[in-house]
Amino acid sequence: MSDIKQLISIIIPVFNESESIGFLLDEVINVMSFHKFNFELIVVNDGSKDNTQQVLKQLTLKIKELSVISLRKNYGQTAAMSAGFDNSKGDIVITLDGDLQNDPNDIPILISEINNGYDLICGWRFDRKDKLINRKIPSKIANKLIANVTGLKLHDYGCSLKAFKKEIIDDIKLYGELHRFLPVLANIEGARIKEIKVNHRSRQYGTSTVSYTHLTLPTTFGV
């Protein structure tokens, strides 16, 4: 059972996701309403070049929990996530992608783990639906590199589906590409961290905007 006094902030950075964002918000609202969570939705439009902004404007007229932050240009996921964090009011903050590959049905599990005493819950896409060469292999290499260098052993640093206690978010300042290192930064702050398996779905609309050129060693670690 949910704590009705507890506010959950759900942050969704988007870039050119006009086809998927409406379906995603419907799914999130259905899950949160079924579990009787008190929640807010924050969608950060990271300089989309399609009609994402127009779609979001229409959605705000129908969804009372929804607020939209619009960035003037495409600043990247770290800046978009940081803008969402800065405007969130929840006791627990959830992040997920806007492309429907993260499954909103996993959100209640993450919230439950936070309420069990953890500060950060990280999703692990143990059965990824990406193409092997394009996504899985570079991701696996990056995860091993980050784990070996930082000492924090996670299977999936790149999964956007995460849950944070608000006070952990307040202690972390993001810049550059540091959203990839949120678990490491939280660990430095003494956070209790747990990784759990989550569902991963195939992309139904559009194409991925993720480039894996950042997975070279110098750019991955900011040197």
Sequence positions of predicted segments:
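Structured catalytic core of nucleotide-sugar glycosyltransferases
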Residues: 1-132
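Single conserved hydrophobic/aromatic residue that forms the stacking wall/gate
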Residues: 214-223
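Short loop/turn motifs enriched for small/polar and acidic residues
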Residues: 44, 199-201
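Broad structural signal for hydrophobic residues in well-ordered alpha-helices, predominantly aliphatic
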Residues: 59, 145-146, 223
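Conserved alpha/beta core of the MobA/IspD/sugar-nucleotide pyrophosphorylase nucleotidyltransferase superfamily
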Residues: 194-198
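Acceptor/aglycone-binding surface of glycosyltransferases and processive sugar-polymer synthases
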Residues: 69-73, 77-87, 101-185, 201-215
